[in-house]
Curated annotation (Swiss-Prot):
CDD domains: IPMI. It comes from the Bacteria. It is an enzyme of class 4 (lyase). This is 3-isopropylmalate dehydratase large subunit. Binds 1 [4Fe-4S] cluster per subunit. The keyword Amino-acid biosynthesis applies. Gene3D superfamilies: Aconitase, domain 3. It catalyses: (2R,3S)-3-isopropylmalate = (2S)-2-isopropylmalate. InterPro entries: 3-IsopropMal_deHydase_lsu (IPR004430), Acnase/IPM_dHydase_lsu_aba_1/3 (IPR015931), Acoase/IPM_deHydtase_lsu_aba (IPR001030), Aconitase_4Fe-4S_BS (IPR018136), Aconitase_4Fe-4S_dom (IPR036008), IPM_dehydratase_rel_enz (IPR050067), IPMI_cat (IPR033941). Keywords: 4Fe-4S, Amino-acid biosynthesis, Branched-chain amino acid biosynthesis, Iron, Iron-sulfur, Leucine biosynthesis, Lyase, Metal-binding. The gene is leuC. [4Fe-4S] cluster binds at C353, C414, C417. It holds the Pfam family Aconitase. Pathway: Amino-acid biosynthesis; L-leucine biosynthesis; L-leucine from 3-methyl-2-oxobutanoate: step 2/4.
Length: 472
């Protein structure tokens, strides 16, 4: 009998019962909530007269709709100008109080993007099943978790039962060996993976990221990669537990202590795929060949190394891709064969659940230090992923580096990743963004998004256009 993959182990450890149709009822260890996908779920509980099944499993924080300017933030919920956004944040507050659920409110130092806050607080622990009403919940798989997004009706189901009916995915291994070159980051790795397999490449699979590159990678880097497993078509992305994982978790607020810690570590050390485990699909990349990446189109798979030009229709693999590229040229205002350096940028956004942790901010600051934002850039903003990330960055003096260079230093939240708050692109504007999606209108109606790493975004802000950060 073949060994088990990490995904197999996590799945099997959480099966409550298997149903006749092959689906399983899974136990959920951690449920993270935010203001956008939870109101209807809480309303469903109220209408049915139910209470959350296990209060301690649930933790909430507002992130999508919160303002990131200090003036608005200082006013708390009252500072949210948009009526719908304000009501959603207030409703989360009200529901958490009514149901006795822990919430890191809008001006709590622990508030932030839910996928930054969970690991930061030790709410995300190896071996857990973690769900949230947000597609980028795969982020938490960096800790050897089975983590994925759920819909609003499922949010209610988890609140009420602490269980969820799921169908098991197939297993995919994405192995990246070798050593990354200077200026090549985890964001570049995951963009290169998506560029190779496409946004449907992982559909129906749980992806395990393995190989030397991921063994060498920091935990925050692994979070960046797992965050974008969803853009590769998978619902789940994960990395095996190792000493780095355990060290990162140790001492965090919600991490186990004393004898429970020792017991947990003994279990966590089993959370890796067996040597004889068989995967349904294997994808391999050479890390030494990966360059800094820039997305040029309207899908994360429309991505190229910074040294390349916008592809021509002759390079498309089929008619579907030719049609997609033609539409992307038009929406993005680009020409086939155009050099990336010729794209005039308007804004730069460094933040999001993909790249707003302290390592990301340090990487950007290293590029920015002693330089100035180009006069042609209308706005360059740094949005830390949580109040604690912001606090740590300020302790290190990183905020001063950015402010002296002409960046805006913002309050934590999802910000310009998506057009659900005050931070938006205007029609036709090009933005170098460290977020995870470059769909039409994602950052604002008519906005044009280019996905890059924090270092590449910082370099673009200084130059006013895309440059190879390796030359900085």
């Amino acid at each position: 009998m073949a060994g088990k993959t990490l995904y197999d182990k996590l799945w099997d450890d959480h099966v409550v019962t298997q149903r006749d149709d092959g689906s399983c009822l899974l136990y959920i260890d951690r449920h993270l909530l935010h203001e956008v996908t939870s109101p209807q779920a809480f309303e469903g509980l109220q209408l049915a007269g139910r209470q959350p099944w296990r209060l301690s499993a649930n933790v909430a924080t507002p992130d999508h709709n919160v303002p990131t300017s200090k003036k608005e933030r200082d006013q708390g919920i009252a500072g949210i100008e948009d009526d719908t956004s304000r009501i959603q944040v207030q409703t989360l507050d009200d529901n958490c109080k009514a149901f006795y659920i822990v919430e890191f409110g809008i001006n709590d130092i622990r508030q932030g993007i839910v996928h930054v806050v969970g690991p930061e607080q030790g709410l995300t622990l190896p071996g857990m099943t973690v769900v949230c009403g947000d597609s980028h919940t795969a982020t938490h798989g960096a800790f050897g978790c089975l983590a994925h997004g759920i819909g609003t009706s499922e949010v209610e189901h988890v609140l009420a039962t602490q269980c969820l009916v799921q169908k098991k995915s197939k297993n995919m291994l994405v192995r990246v060996d070798g050593v990354l070159g200077k200026g090549v980051t985890p964001k570049d790795v995951v963009l290169a993976i998506i560029g190779k397999i496409g946004t449907a490449g992982g559909t129906g699979y749980a992806i395990e990221f393995g190989g030397q590159v991921f063994r060498d990678m920091s935990i925050e880097g692994r979070m960046t990669v797992c965050n974008m497993a969803i853009e590769a078509g998978a619902r789940v992305g994960m990395v095996a537990v190792d000493d780095k994982t355990i060290e990162y978790v140790k001492g965090r607020s919600y991490a186990p202590k004393g004898e429970q810690w020792e017991q947990a570590v003994a279990y966590w050390n089993t959370l890796h795929s067996d040597d004889d485990a068989v995967f349904d699909a294997v994808v391999e990349l050479n890390g030494a060949e990966i360059e800094p990446q820039v997305s040029w189109g309207t899908s994360p798979e429309m991505v190229i190394p910074v040294s390349k030009a916008v592809p021509t229709l002759e390079q498309a693999k089929d008619d579907v891709q030719r049609n997609d590229w033609t539409r992307a040229y038009q929406y993005m205002g680009l020409n086939a064969g155009q050099a990336l350096a010729d794209i005039q940028l308007d804004r730069v956004f460094i933040g999001s659940c993909t790249n707003s942790r302290i390592e990301d901010i340090r990487a950007a600051a290293e590029v920015v230090k002693g330089r100035k934002v180009a006069p042609s850039i209308k706005q360059a903003m740094i949005v830390p992923g949580s109040g604690l990330v912001k606090q740590q960055a300020e302790k290190e003096g990183l905020d001063k580096i950015f402010l002296e260079a002409g960046f805006e230093w913002r309050e934590p939240g999802c910000s310009m990743c998506l057009a659900m708050n005050a931070d938006k692109l205007q029609p036709g504007e090009h933005c170098a963004s460290t977020s995870n999606r470059n769909f039409e209108g994602r950052q604002g109606n008519g906005g044009r998004t280019h996905l890059v790493s924090p270092a590449m975004a910082a370099a673009a802000a200084i130059a006013g256009h895309f440059v190879d950060v390796r030359s900085f």
